[in-house]
Amino acid sequence: GHVKETKTWFQTLRLSLLSLALLPISLWAGVSDVQLPTGGSVTVGSAQVSQNNNTLNVHQNSQNVGIQWDTFNIGQNATVNFYQPNTSSIAVNRVLDSNASQIMGKLNANGQVFLLNPNGVIFSKTAQVNVGGIVASTLNVTDSDIISGNFTLKNQSNAASVENYGSVIANGGVVAFIAPTVINEGQIQAHNGVIHLTA
């Protein structure tokens, strides 16, 4: 027989910029193994948020939705699922927390997920992200951006970072980390997609 070629291509980035051992221990403090995002409030568009034990489900009804969260942390044994109308649907999650969002468990979505926290986003070694596409940033967008689908990331004054030490897989979309400091020591795969690490 002959070797069957796969049509999907992927990129794997392994950039060793900073040892995890150098991170202050306080960065990882305060998130339990079953921690889930809190205070989800839909600001534009339509979605329902429900929780079942250590799993949080977001059922998105509109093509684009904006959700404001008090905190957006996912513990090591916790899962957040976004069920979206299609692969190009966008869920914009804006986080009000004074601390960085810590993603230590599973984040799943069939569409595009924006995770915006001016104080940073950190994917730990145990993070497993499997989405259509993901944007993690310390910048922000407006409700009108979400409605129009034309996103202009607005600058924030915080000198925070987006850091990945885990596994991030995007099936056909963009993986974009945008912050004053971007660190990737984990694995990023964008099947038929694009990877942007922008500081």
Predicted feature descriptions by range:
Residues V3, L13, L18, L22-A199:
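Solvent-exposed adhesion/ligand-recognition segments of exported proteins
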Residues G1-W9:
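N-terminal secretory signal peptides that target proteins for export/translocation
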